[in-house]
Amino acid sequence: LQTRPPKEMGGSGEGVNPELLFSAGYAACFLGALRLVAKNSDVQLDDATSVTVQIGIGKDDTSFALSANIIGYLPALSQQQAEELMGKANQVCPYSKATRGNIDVTTSAKV
């Protein structure tokens, strides 16, 4: 697997970059956590339920920093239920645990 820096960092933008791979892993992990907390809460998720993670990268005076925007698509639920499950999933997701206090992470739910 060959990686390339994103255009934002002077790369060609072709192929995969570490941020893309990180977002794919985070999204898959968060979806698993979401399904777990839904099951434990006796909430049935629709098959169309999905998670997208957008990873941002920026530079400060001395280094680079990441940020993550996690968007859950939970079409079978109310907005309140969806937001509650997203919050619970964020507490148990291993990627969220690993990034907590290290990068800015936001979550949102769409129904």
Question: Could you say what each language-model-derived stretch is?
Answer:
Residues 1-24, 31-111:
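Extended beta-strand/beta-hairpin segments
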